[in-house]
Amino acid sequence: MYTLKIIPRTLHFKQPAGTSRGVYHTRQVWYLLLTDTETGQYGVGECAPLPALSCDDLPDYPRLLAEICEKTAANGYIDYEGLRPYPSILFGLETAFAHLQANSLQFWDTPFSRGEQGIPINGLIWMGNFDEMYRRIEEKMKAGFRCIKVKIGAIEFERELELLAHIRRHFSAADIELRVDANGAFSPEDALRKLTQLNEFQLHSIEQPVRAGQWEVMKELCATSPFPIALDEELIGVNETERKILLLDTIRPQYIILKPSLHGGIQGSKEWITLAQERGIGYWVTSALESNIGLNAIAQWCATLQPKMPQGLGTGMLFTDNIDYPLHIEGDCLWFHPEEKIPDFPTYLQTI
């Protein structure tokens, strides 16, 4: 028998997080406390839909979450098929069950979970004004990141080109891999021209150059862009297997980016990977502004994929009121240190 308790929490960013959908100052999450009533063991999960972005960012989310948790606790298992439309809820349940079943934060046995190997990550440059972004780029370069991802679309395009030129004046493509994320900021009419201008800086890839939902436009861009395109928002809400196949076969992207909270939980992300690999499409894994509870789950799973290219797993460190986890960014890798003490869940959740 299981019980599932829902603990809402508002997290506060250390500094405003600028995205294409505005600036985040706080972050609403729902923690799930799953308890085995026979053994007393528990697992903690995190449901963290992104406002105006997640397909399950619904007005009645708390009620829906309560109903699903009640049903899951009664059944004793996760209804993966039934939860396809609700990726953030599925991810929270997956995380809670994985934690309980492992009775440890080391959900799977990997060199990462044993503290023997880090996961390479990119240094993320948030949207901001020119001076802010310039300073952040300097910090990431000094910290030793070999892959830097710059969010673009917030300031004038010419100024963004200046920022990329600044990086390339100091580091060649062999020294630092550059990725950009447009978050759908380009118009279909301007996109190819801007991609051609960006190509001057020997970029690894660009995420979501145009707004999601324009499959034919994106298909044409993926076929004609001088450097690779990665789909991100395009995958949101594409939850059924047949639709995933149709999307990949229509657009034929070079990469897809997988965020379990947005793209079907861990189970749904695995399905995306299988379908992508069958088509020769690359991928990497990214967190989506979760706290350390969600970040650890994503990182533990990501490590089972044995990633070689940099992943997007640094965002758990963004909050002033995060829970302490044995996760650390060292150089340009995320490390897990199992010898460190486990988080103080009773105090943090104030319910156990």
Label every model-predicted segment.
Residues 123, 257, 312-313:
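Structural signal for conserved beta-strand scaffold positions within catalytic alpha/beta enzyme cores
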Residues 155-296, 300, 319-330:
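Catalytic core of soluble alpha/beta enzymes
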